UniProtKB/Swiss-Prot annotation:
[4Fe-4S] cluster binds at residues 126, 213, 310. This is Quinolinate synthase. The lineage of its organism: Bacteria, Pseudomonadati, Pseudomonadota, Betaproteobacteria, Burkholderiales. Its main location: cytoplasm. One of its GO terms (biological process) is 'de novo' NAD biosynthetic process from L-aspartate. The gene is nadA. It holds the Pfam family NadA. Iminosuccinate binds at residues 60, 81, 152-154, 169, 239-241, 256. GO terms for cellular component: cytosol. It catalyses: iminosuccinate + dihydroxyacetone phosphate = quinolinate + phosphate + 2 H2O + H(+). InterPro entries: NadA, NadA_sf, Quinolinate_synth_A_type1. Its EC number is 2.5.1.72. PANTHER family: QUINOLINATE SYNTHASE, CHLOROPLASTIC, QUINOLINATE SYNTHETASE A. It comes from Herminiimonas arsenicoxydans. Belongs to the quinolinate synthase family. Type 1 subfamily. Pathway: Cofactor biosynthesis; NAD(+) biosynthesis; quinolinate from iminoaspartate: step 1/1.
Length: 379
């Protein structure tokens, strides 16, 4: 098997003051790609150890297709970060193996403090998490004590511990709308694009932390318009972590689960997809026969026309998954006090969703497609 390699990644790191940011650097360790024969052997050993260790595998839509398939065929879960944690909480397994990025493992631990939470690579992080350091976030909150603090799921446990509400991309609109009706002013973190989208849809008074997802931030509106002309029958599916100019070109705006459902149910032969291309595996399974095209990124540092894949999601592989099952290493720990505080904002969201009996809210420009979004879970 070839040797893994390290690559340096640039991302935007905002400061406390709204609008100020600098270029920061992080790294990702890309695992080697096993041969077909090695894949078979690795999967067989992983299946055996999951059963032997009384463990269950949960994987995000953005990780490698082999991991997604393995999670499903062994009775695990392939979903969004919150549903991964919910599934792990409700599953009888004593050990939960999370194939994703670190905040997902932390959320799983917060919801299941009594369980062992393992991850293939503890260094798999997120630019939204990195771009919202807890000390600066505390200072930001302290500077605006009159605002309700609402944070996106893509944050550390320590940031969640300071929040009044945690939201996912599918229920964020409803929660902010609820707070807006109550006359609340909101401090939002960390994704400026998702926050701006929700602000536009609800009219809420929102002060936005200026973070962004390095994958979604790279989608380009001009190139997307050109691609639409090349594929006139295609519908455009966009995650709201994308820039506003890209969202404006969408036929459907939504969370990962919502976009998969839209691909399955919308009457179109082709779809241009503006989110991490790891989702295409699930879309192709949900809508066989339809064609899926990566939305163009082509950023300044890009080496491909569309290279929309999170480098940290790519750190999850079959070999390091096997390694943690064999060794028990890479366990997620959350300080009990931080976990207790973070539970408050998560439970508040879950209680709100249960009371509403509606976990999603399509964007206003999708009123004609309301039926497509009934009964979809959070993402």
């Amino acid at each position: 098997m070839q040797t893994q390699f390290i690559k340096t990644i640039e991302f935007e790191r905002p400061g406390m003051e709204s609008g100020s940011s600098c270029v920061a650097h992080a790294w990702a360790r890309t695992p080697a790609t096993p041969s077909p024969e090695e894949k078979i052997a690795l999967k067989d050993r992983i299946r055996h150890l999951l059963k032997e260790r009384e463990a269950v595998l949960v994987a995000h839509y953005y990780v490698d297709a082999d991991l997604q398939d393995l999670a499903e065929e062994t009775g695990g879960c392939v979903s969004d970060s919150l549903e991964m944690a919910r599934f792990g909480r409700d599953h009888p397994a004593k050990t939960l193996v999370v194939a994703g990025v670190k905040f997902m493992g932390e959320t799983a631990k917060i919801l299941s403090p009594e369980k062992t939470i393992l991850m293939p690579d503890l260094d798999a992080t997120c630019s939204l998490d990195l771009g919202c350091p807890v000390d600066e976030f505390h200072a930001f909150c302290d500077a605006h004590p009159d605002r309700v603090v609402v944070v996106y799921a893509n944050t550390s446990a320590a940031v969640k511990a300071r929040a009044d509400w945690m939201v996912t991309s599918s229920i964020g609109l409803k929660i902010v709308e609820h707070l807006h009706v109550q006359g609340k002013k909101i401090l939002w973190a960390p994704d400026k694009h998702l926050g701006g989208y929700i602000q536009k849809q609800t009219g809420a008074d929102m002060l936005l932390w200026q973070g962004s997802c390095l994958v979604h931030d790279e989608f380009k509106a001009v190139e997307l318009e050109l691609l639409k002309k090349e594929h006139p029958l295609a519908k455009v599916l966009v995650h709201p972590e994308s820039p506003a100019a890209v969202v404006a070109l969408a036929d459907a705006v939504g969370s990962t689960s919502q976009l998969i459902h839209a691909a399955q149910t919308m009457d179109a032969p082709e779809f241009i997809v503006a989110t991490d291309n790891g989702i295409l595996h699930k879309m192709k399974m949900a809508a066989p026969g339809k064609i899926f095209i990566d939305a163009p990124t082509a950023g300044n540092s890009a080496t491909c026309k569309s290279c929309a894949h999170c480098p940290w999601m790519a750190m999850n592989g079959l070999q390091n998954l096997l390694d943690v099952l064999e060794s028990g290493r890479n366990e997620i720990h959350v300080d009990p006090e931080i976990g207790r505080k973070a539970t408050v904002c998560i439970d508040r969201m879950l209680d709100f969703a249960a009371a509403q009996k509606a976990n999603v809210r399509p964007s206003s420009d999708l009123a004609k497609e309301q039926k497509l979004f009934s009964g979809i879970g959070p993402a």
